[in-house]
A protein has these predicted regions:
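Patatin-like phospholipase
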Residues: 1-35, 43-168
């Protein structure tokens, strides 16, 4: 049995219900592929998370914390509060030239979250060696063609698969 899980933002979390059903029926999954949110759900399942664990994770995670880079106002100095989040142009600290940020949201929060979730396999760089072999799909922003990722850091692969160029 092979599973291919597509993207679709939060709609991709519907696969959690499918995985819970697969677990309840004791169906053995032989391999998984996914893109975007489907890669996150599928990748976590491939490394050993069960459907009920993914359900709990989906329900109990403060997704807005991870999908934005908003800093709580109590962490910003009084002097900075008036200016916080006000400008769409950054000053490059190396060249001192103004420019646009690389992305509206740089994704550091979600990257850290994915690193935490995938820590159990941080030492495995070949995704075929996971409990369930896994591949995720991203898009090469230069060519616009799909790229299949099955080696390297799982957290980075998942983050790459869910990226939206210039936005996230």
């Amino acid at each position: 049995v092979g599973l291919t899980l597509s993207g679709g933002g939060a709609k991709g979390l519907i696969y959690v219900g499918l995985l819970k059903m697969i677990d309840s029926l004791n169906i053995k999954v032989d391999y998984i592929t996914g893109t975007s949110m489907g890669s996150i759900v599928g990748g976590l399942y491939a490394i050993g998370y069960k459907g009920n664990e993914l359900d709990s994770l989906a329900r109990n995670t403060n997704w807005s914390k991870y999908l934005t880079n908003n800093v709580p106002l109590n962490k910003i100095t009084m002097e900075e509060k008036d200016e916080y989040g006000k400008y769409m142009i950054e000053l490059n600290s190396n060249t001192l030239m103004p420019g646009l940020p690389i992305a509206v949201i740089n994704g550091q929060n979600i990257t850290s979250f994915l690193n935490d979730l995938t820590f159990r396999v941080h030492h495995i760089s070949d995704f075929n060696k996971f409990p369930i072999p896994f591949k995720c799909v991203a898009v090469d922003i230069v060519t616009g063609k799909p790229v299949v990722i099955d080696k390297g850091s799982l957290a980075l692969a998942l983050r790459t698969s869910m990226s939206i160029p210039t936005a996230f």
